[in-house]
Amino acid sequence: TTLLRMINRMIEPSAGRVRINGTDTAQLPPHLLRRGIGYVIQGHGLFPHRTVAENIAVVPRLLGWKTARIADRVDELLELVQLDPATFRDRRPHELSGGQQQRVGVARALAARPDILLMDEPFGALDLLTRERAQADLQRIRLELGTTVVLITHDLAEATSLADRVAVMDRGRILQVATPETLMRRPVSDFVAALIGGTERPFRLLALCPVSKLREPGNAGGPPISATASLHAAL
């Protein structure tokens, strides 16, 4: 959480620098910096007295967008997170499921088209099934929009399934930054190796490889397996 807040300057670093696209963020006015950064917290953080549309529209209203543009953006984002605008636009947070609340939280963070999305354990409060759907939604949105996502999680499986690069931290220090596969194959310390787990490591590696990479031509019996499924799922 402290690391995320240093990225958007809610906390100023006591040493070192934070750079975005090579620019030292300390040289930018904080309010201008934050306009390019969305923030999703654990438990969604929606305003309970406002509708879904009003929650999503918070930042665009602060930026002075016209009403019609805001309405169009709200509907666009609800469709992006796969919530029907006509059904959900006027609901309040207590009328939504946990997964729906989290989707609205993501939509709100994306409202002003930020280049970076900060997510602080966004799925920690969700049940397993809802969490898996939310992770799939995030991956789809990230690929569709090209947004850079910095996500904090204590779940290694979540990190390796979602991330292009994983940074392992302990006591406020980054121990290793690597692709999920490199992290699994070459942990740099006993702490990282223990985090991965000795008996779990082969299965975590299988989860990173799609079936399509090892598929061979020919016929086979049994139920079909999706080419995009992981080898772990196939096993």
Residues of each region from the PLM?
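ABC ATPase "signature
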Residues: 177-178, 186
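Conserved ABC ATPase signature
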Residues: 92-96, 100
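Conserved ABC ATPase "signature" region
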Residues: 68-87
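Conserved ABC transporter NBD signature motif
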Residues: 16-24, 33
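Helix-to-loop junction immediately C-terminal to a conserved catalytic motif
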Residues: 8
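Conserved catalytic motifs of ABC-family nucleotide-binding domains
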Residues: 113
